[in-house]
Amino acid sequence: MGLWIDATAGVAGDMLLGALIDAGAELEKIQQVVEAVIPGDVLLRTEEVVRQGQRGIKLHVDAQHEHHHHRHLSTIKELLVNADIPEQTKQDALGVFELIAIAEGKVHGIEPEKIHFHEVGAWDSIADIVGVCEAIRQLNPGLIAASPIALGFGRIKAAHGDIPVPVPAVAELVKGWPTQTGALMESTEPVGELATPTGVALIRHFATQDGPFPGGIINEVGIGAGTKDTEGRPNIVRAILFNTSRSNPDTRTLVQLEANVDDQDPRLWPGVIEILFAAGAVDAWLTPILMKKGRPAHRVSALVDSSEVEAVKTALFAATTTFGIRSWEVEREGLDRRFEQVEVDGHTINIKIGSRDDQVISAQSEFEDIRSAAVALGISEREVVARIPQGTTE
């Protein structure tokens, strides 16, 4: 199953969460997860509203005991790490806050860990981020794509005074992602802020593909509504769940980068692969080769989304001794993916399941989970694998 997020009218965390709930995520379970992170402080509720003739779900986040909005990244990390919530939700939420902190750090010229959040540090924004992460865990899409993001234009009042739209943090977060102003047709009037840092960070964390609706069999259409009822355009975010298995397999057009290197210290290669992944590579690998005059060498390769090509090229030049990089477009078809969780002596193991035409083709345990369980239980990784319950894909 795939998820496509339509942000052509903008995006905010509460709107995206409303859309995901409308598409089938369970509000009660989301509330339980949010409660585990910030106990007794936030109540989530939904309301069906109409925005310019379009029905949608308005999510209300009622903060019961909000004292201040200025929370450091370390404080929010501590809340998440100590919360008894699904590990996938926890890691995704940590990743989103890290993205925002990096963007804010660039804007203010300080280290991400020293950032103190303003609006994003409020209970309602924390609830939005944790809620969306849990909703996506529940829906479990194998592919997440999103449209170009409408940013708006003009100026708004914020914690740091009168600032331009897109606000500085959003401008950092959307680097490499297609955007549009979101201006109404035949109008030059400023439309204000359409995309918030929270909304943009959620898309950048989850979406691996940009562009129009990828096509397929639509199963659900969730509509999340904003607070304003803007004249001339519904103030909504759409979350469309679709089946890709029969009419549109998970096929992506990627760019393959390659370089032959014969003078690199071999001890550096593991770090090179890590650097390529950190720069945005979808996959990266090393192949032993023989070059002219029988010299042993390595071919380093990476598969990259078009939006990340320059970043990965820069990383490859910096991390190796190569003087040139080859590149070409390739298509990669993948299985539809979903995750199931099993328990081994109280430790969660994620199982990645691949299917095609609704038939399970492959089921593989996540090795990092196996390793963590082995260390915690004081047994071998092989023993952990042997204890994984059979029939998880049935």
Swiss-Prot record:
The protein's name in its UniProt record: Pyridinium-3,5-bisthiocarboxylic acid mononucleotide nickel insertion protein
GO molecular function, one term: nickel cation binding
Keywords assigned: Lyase, Nickel
Chemical reaction(s) catalysed: Ni(II)-pyridinium-3,5-bisthiocarboxylate mononucleotide = pyridinium-3,5-bisthiocarboxylate mononucleotide + Ni(2+)
Pfam families: Ni_insertion
EC number: 4.99.1.12
One annotated GO biological process: protein maturation
EC class (word): lyase
Family (UniProt): Belongs to the LarC family.
Taxon lineage: Bacteria, Bacillati, Actinomycetota, Actinomycetes, Mycobacteriales
Chain segments annotated as coiled-coil in the UniProt record: none
HAMAP family from the UniProt entry: LarC
GTP-binding among keywords: no
Biological function: Involved in the biosynthesis of a nickel-pincer cofactor ((SCS)Ni(II) pincer complex). Binds Ni(2+), and functions in nickel delivery to pyridinium-3,5-bisthiocarboxylic acid mononucleotide (P2TMN), to form the mature cofactor. Is thus probably required for the activation of nickel-pincer cofactor-dependent enzymes.
